[in-house]
């Protein structure tokens, strides 16, 4: 398939720059995978779509204030976006500068340039930096870092984003982007779900900046996926197996939960799913056979992104592109701070034949 097959027209006005005043106050577009039927509603309708015994799987990663501004000690301005924390003092980071720093370059970071760091080495597109400070990396970032809002939210980060660009259940520090489907869940909503008998489990996937990188090839099969660290512990495996055994649905909250669960399934030698601790580069696009996830809660994604490809593999390509066309027509809010979808899996999606520009693709 071509990347261009996943393009759609999106007016700039539909990109949400701020979240709704109430987390669960967003709109919800429900897509029935087997039929393609669409239903318009609000996020709290989810309570009526789930039944006792269904399992919601959340990603409990916590976004770090990963963006730093500063300069080289020699003078040139730069911007640092931490991609991964290696230990208490070293990180891998994207560095934006007029001239890339060389190993040994001293950096002065933070709005007041109070943080000293050294560029140790370059690893492809990432730079290994060491913070020359007695405090650990997370403490430094919390003190001087900026929240790494997505590039399409065209405004400076604000103090409120430290709370709003974070799920209420986030625990594990390490993401540089929020698992945004989870932003819609507030404490009253979680309490109502528990009261109804909905089970909950938590995976961890530290979302990297690669989630916003455009696909730079014409044919999606040629795309090389970025790597992210994920954990699917034994208790999640047990919860998934118990859910399947009682005939209920595994409902992934967000594409990162999908990628975590499906990575754990692929790593299982015998059985449906096994514990998973490590880097995943799983790339899900039409033709993929889902092994674990039965339903998906997700936001609206960028045109030509790997995430709209993942959704197309789940709901079916035609169903997905039709839903997006309807969402634009009905003026749903898009991307990280936007509205949500609830999608049930289309069992025919993996064999759907797509005919575009007189070319049949599997």
Swiss-Prot record:
Family designation: Belongs to the QueA family.
Role according to the record: Transfers and isomerizes the ribose moiety from AdoMet to the 7-aminomethyl group of 7-deazaguanine (preQ1-tRNA) to give epoxyqueuosine (oQ-tRNA).
Pathway(s) it belongs to: tRNA modification; tRNA-queuosine biosynthesis
Gene transcribed to yield this protein: queA
UniProt EC number: 2.4.99.17
GO biological process, one term: tRNA wobble guanine modification
PANTHER family documented for this protein: S-ADENOSYLMETHIONINE:TRNA RIBOSYLTRANSFERASE-ISOMERASE
Quaternary context: Monomer.
Organism listed in the record: Yersinia enterocolitica serotype O:8 / biotype 1B (strain NCTC 13174 / 8081)
Single GO molecular function: S-adenosylmethionine:tRNA ribosyltransferase-isomerase activity
Enzyme category, top tier: transferase
Protein known as: S-adenosylmethionine:tRNA ribosyltransferase-isomerase
Pfam families hit by this protein: Queuosine_synth
Intracellular or extracellular location(s): Cytoplasm
Principal place of residence: cytoplasm
InterPro entries, alphabetized: QueA, QueA_dom1, QueA_dom2, QueA_sf
Record key words, sorted: Cytoplasm, Queuosine biosynthesis, S-adenosyl-L-methionine, Transferase
Catalyzed chemical reaction(s): 7-aminomethyl-7-carbaguanosine(34) in tRNA + S-adenosyl-L-methionine = epoxyqueuosine(34) in tRNA + adenine + L-methionine + 2 H(+)
Gene Ontology CC terms, in alphabetical order: cytoplasm
Membrane spanning stretches: none
């Amino acid at each position: 398939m071509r990347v261009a097959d996943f393009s759609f027209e999106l007016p700039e006005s539909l990109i949400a720059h701020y979240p709704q005043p109430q987390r669960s106050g967003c709109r919800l577009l429900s897509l029935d995978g087997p039929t393609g039927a669409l239903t318009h509603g609000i996020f709290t309708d989810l309570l009526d779509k789930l039944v006792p015994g269904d399992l919601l799987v959340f990603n409990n990663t916590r976004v770090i204030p990963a963006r730093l501004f500063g300069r080289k000690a020699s003078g040139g301005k730069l911007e640092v976006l931490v991609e991964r924390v290696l230990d208490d003092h070293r990180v891998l980071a994207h560095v934006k500068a007029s001239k890339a720093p060389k190993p040994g370059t001293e950096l002065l970071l933070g709005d007041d340039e109070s943080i000293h760091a050294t560029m140790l080495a370059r690893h492809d597109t990432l730079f290994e930096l060491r913070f020359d400070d007695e405090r650990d990396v997370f403490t430094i970032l919390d003190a001087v870092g900026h929240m790494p809002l997505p590039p399409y939210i065209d405004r400076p980060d604000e103090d409120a984003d430290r709370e709003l660009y974070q799920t209420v259940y986030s625990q594990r520090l390490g993401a540089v982007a929020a698992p945004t489907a989870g932003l819609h869940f507030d404490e009253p909503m979680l309490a109502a779900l528990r009261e109804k008998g909905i089970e909950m489990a938590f995976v961890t996937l530290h979302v990297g900046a690669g989630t916003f990188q455009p696909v730079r090839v014409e044919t999606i099969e040629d795309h090389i996926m970025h790597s992210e660290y994920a954990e699917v512990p034994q208790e999640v495996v047990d919860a998934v197996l118990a859910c399947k055994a009682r005939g209920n649905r595994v409902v992934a909250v967000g594409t990162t939960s999908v990628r975590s669960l499906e990575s754990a399934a692929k790593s299982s030698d015998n059985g449906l799913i096994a514990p998973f601790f490590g880097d995943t580069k799983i790339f899900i696009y039409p033709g993929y056979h889902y092994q674990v996830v039965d339903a998906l809660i997700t936001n609206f994604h960028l045109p030509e992104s790997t995430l709209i490809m993942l959704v197309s593999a789940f709901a079916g390509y035609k169903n997905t592109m039709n839903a997006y066309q309807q969402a634009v027509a009905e003026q749903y809010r898009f991307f990280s701070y936007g509205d949500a979808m609830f999608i049930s899996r289309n069992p025919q999606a993996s064999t759907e034949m797509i005919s575009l520009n007189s070319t049949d693709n599997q």
